[in-house]
Amino acid sequence: MSFKDLRSFIDHLEANGELKRISYPVDPHLEMTEIADRVLRAQGPALLFENPTNHSMPVLANLFGTPKRVAMALGKDDPLALREVGELLAFLKEPEPPRGFKDAISKIPMFKQALNMPPKTVRNPACQQVVKTGDDVDLTQLPIQHCWPGDVAPLVTWGLTITKGPRKSRQNLGIYRQQLLGKNKLIMRWLSHRGGALDFADFKEQFPGERYPVVVALGSDPVTILGAVTPVPDAMSEYAFAGLLRGERTEVCKALSCDLEVPASSEIILEGYIDPNEMAEEGPYGDHTGYYNETDKFPVFTVTHITHRKDPIYHSTYTGRPPDEPAMLGVALNEVFVPILRKQYPEIIDFYLPPEGCSYRMAVISIRKQYPGHAKRVMMGAWSFLRQFMYTKFIVVVDDDVNCRDWNDVIWAITTRMDPKRDTVMIDNTPIDYLDFASPVVGLGSKMGLDATNKWEGETNREWGTPIVMDPKVKQKIDSIWDELGIS
């Protein structure tokens, strides 16, 4: 099942007991965060706050608060089915030539899918049913959440930011938090390596001093939202990838103030520009690490137009110490990464980003070890293969007899198969998450790799331990008489 807009997904969730409407008045200032956090930690439903205090616009929260709902958004029943998305991405990143006629025939469905990518432009879109310009532009009328007591101001969290570089044919979609600064101003917090910031840097170089057009979509269809947080190949637009996942082209429309294309079914669209000479201090805000982050200067986004559907829904979230919604997204998207990594490194058995590691700061990889030093090669490969892992601080590599998703297994492997000096890799002066205050320098820190695999000749001179395993025949016999033993 595919969803053309957010509302059809809301209806689907409600019909399946995955969404709860809350009619009791709830304040976007702190109260929504507390409720959403309690519900998410209980693995509860998405929430639709129908009567936000001092606002008439409903607020949707916890939309992707469980891996199951992430899978449902992509038309899947089980998060493990998201590996199909990973297989598709792996193919798109490195398409293999057919090995023969039969192989060519088998690849036809995937090639047909790829041809279904370009977005479809529509007229009279739902997202432009109501248009506000000039003095009517007032961001304070939106029920923007103020998530934590130490936050400096309300924060737009699920804005899908749309940009285009002057030398690129495709648009970029990214999700960057945006601090409310005034009736028509937000602070665009994008880090220098992110797609939107790179597009902006290219524009400033080619058109110094000129205003840079930017559009932010709120409440887009779930597939387009997830397309913006998936490792899409650089040459492909997120719109095209969303169409690929949906099985039909993404419907877009032209923005009113510029040539950028926006998701036509979105609930709310913010159009405007960034003046390269206007910056503002952003933060502090509570973040996905569980701490308030440092402040820094970022570009100011001036909103000139607000368009929206009739009776729009405001899509929001909060970030905090895991588990939070980004952590749940990370758990689901973990399954997308597995086939992509296996394509490059077939020896990888499984890959796990524990949610306690703030979505990406720690990874555990199980491999079918084939030679001395193999674990170290896999570490280096994981750090460098996808941009998503450039901020991963710790990588643990284990053998294929260890379940990399079971901390009992992983800790056993670390404590029995590692010598701290021999089997630890330390790398200095590497890119680190800007929000990581533990690093000695902002954006620059170290990485640690832990080789918790069995050691081969050349890696040790000692006789290696043999794991204790019960005789299979004995296990089979005990299984057969277990009920007669009377042990519960």
UniProtKB/Swiss-Prot annotation:
Species this protein is from: Shewanella oneidensis (strain ATCC 700550 / JCM 31522 / CIP 106686 / LMG 19005 / NCIMB 14063 / MR-1)
Tagged with keyword Oxidoreductase: no
Name this protein carries in UniProt: 3-octaprenyl-4-hydroxybenzoate carboxy-lyase
Essential cofactor(s): prenylated FMN; Mn(2+)
GO molecular function: 3-octaprenyl-4-hydroxybenzoate carboxy-lyase activity; metal ion binding
Residues that coordinate or bind Mn(2+): N172, E238
Residues annotated as signal peptide: none
GO annotation terms (biological process): ubiquinone biosynthetic process
